[in-house]
Amino acid sequence: MPLLPPYGGLTRMPNRLAGETSPYLLQHKDNPVDWYAWGPEALERARETDRPILLSIGYSACHWCHVMERESFEDSETAAYMNEHFVPIKVDREERPDVDSIYMEAVQGMTGHGGWPLTAFLDPDGVPFYGGTYFPPDPRHGMPSFRMVMEAVVQSWTTKRDRIRASADRIKHQLGAVGRIEAVDEELIPDLLDQATSTLGSIADMERGGFGSAPKFPPASALELLLARGMTDPVEVTLDAMAFGGIYDQIGGGFARYSVDDVWLVPHFEKMLYDNALLARTYLHGWQTLGHERYRRVCEETLVWALREMRGPEGGFHSALDADSEGEEGRFYLWTPAQIREALEGVGSPGVADDVIAYYGAKEEGNFEGRNILHVPGGAEAAPPAELDDARRAMYTYRSRRVWPGKDDKRLCSWNALMVGALAEAGAALPCRDYLDAAVAGAEFIWRDLRDENGRLLRTYKDSRAHLAAYLEDYAYVVEALLALYEATFDVRWFDAARETADLMIELFADDERGGFFTTAHDHEELVVRRKDLDDHPIPSGNSAAAFGLLRLAALTGEHEYERRAVGVFRLLQRAAVRHPQALAHLLCGMDFYFASVKEVALVAPAGGDGLGDLASVVRSGFRPHVVLAGGPEGTDRPELLRDRGTVDGEPAAYVCQNFACQRPVTEPEALAASLNQ
């Protein structure tokens, strides 16, 4: 008897998600669920049918998102119930952070916790009234089943509509509070920055690294603040703990998203572009400050990982690698001692495999489900085997023959900007031409392929299609990245592009009444509320990045309006930053820059020549968080910092200005270094 195809003998056509660009949404295109993407069509369908909306939010590298899909969304009975009683909507949180942030805040307020997959129930106007995260197919560990939750919602929707309306109204009012935060009518207070930094240092885990208890996320912005403020001890502990832990891919480079435990051993294995861009930059700054070559190595291995495994043909970077392969979390990255020996057969001298096994703490019984997450138990004190580099290359080749984790190959504007900035800084500091070339290619991709016909940024790109209006973080990160690229290359087109982007950001997102910036543009589709992106976790908020970028522009141009807009952000949040320094660490970095006596360095070459390399390397080679840099031939008028400056006796000259006064120009790198180090 022939086997019947699924769904009662009929071959099911893909659902509405088949036309989307998000790899996460495309993963659900063959579900029997009648999914809608977020948009007016879905909301109108809910109003027409008087059904509640079942909103499911996730992302492609999310392990539990995949689990819930297998258990519930691929189940025909569950799907039939969803289709009959709800209007189901699927959202990729990375493409639509505006939607995700609203409903994540709502669920956290209702349940006290959040995460992905996010499951929320909304009225036809999009107002949430109930929600949670992952729900199992059967009752488990005190959790109701997904079917039980849906049935309870349907019952309440049918018989207790007045209660639902009251709950929705209350939640909507609470959600709007973030956008209504008023700026404190006071001057910025330097002592608050000192207090916040002191608090951050006091909560650092000086034994295991990081802050707080498990799970631990890489705290890049917090470490940047501590480095800028000269508190290097907690930075060193954390950088070592992560670099030698299981959260770092000891064979292929790059960091996983977070550690499940408090010792950085067991990661959640997905690799995100944004984490690795931020951490490459932090390890670069750690090397520049502390001089440890191991930090330079981690920085470079992380960037090489991004260039090797995450770069698209047009110069942009993919978003993430999944945690799972072959249906198991972390399988691609795990090892047994026997596999290590097999990979190293014929490599190096006799006994190298035993040395590598010992160095990486691999045991017969394993440390994760019978296999081993490679780490370095001895940390910085452990002497690596003499042939470790050859061994790692052989193990990488061996591992590459395994089934790879899935790749989310959409290119997000903001995350690409983070990687462009990291490559630009590293390329200038190390120095490395390959990194600079990659940074330029990445910036050209953004400027060419992620803007519309009016010059406005677009959020996402895949398969030669860019779409969705960009958000505040996209504009703010692009400003920071292009300024970093200008300082690394002195190519004035990147300064011009940064300024153009900043001006457009102010026009589209600024809150002229209360200060700061909204997450969405003034002409964005109307959602339940219009929020402000404020927290720097796990990535810098749009407001923090906007403030920092505008301050750097103000220093390069002398344009006070940029500084005024940045101060508006600080006035919103300076009191909160004292109480929650880790959550607002990038904001505090911006405040540190504001309160510091910033040194403005202008390098001038003879007209038609260059010759700035030696002077520029003095500035670029060190970690200088309170310096801005401009350079170009005599007669250049952009940035304004270069205007009316000339060479000295025909030789390239460096001008250092601070507190509205400039020192005499110098021509020798040693003299410039002495001036910067005063």
Model-flagged regions — what are they?
Residues L4-A429, Y461, F570-Q678:
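Replace the tail clause
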Residues G58-C65, I251, F255, L279, ...:
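Extended, hydrophobic alpha-helical segments in both membrane/secreted and soluble proteins
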Residues A241-Y248, A441-D449:
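Glycine-rich, acidic and aromatic/proline-enriched surface loops and short helix-turn segments
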Residues G286-R294, A426-R433, L485-T489, L553-E563:
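Inter-helical turn/loop segments and adjacent helix faces that build the functional surface
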Residues R308-R311, R448-A476, A481-D637:
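Long, polar/charge-rich, low-hydrophobicity segments
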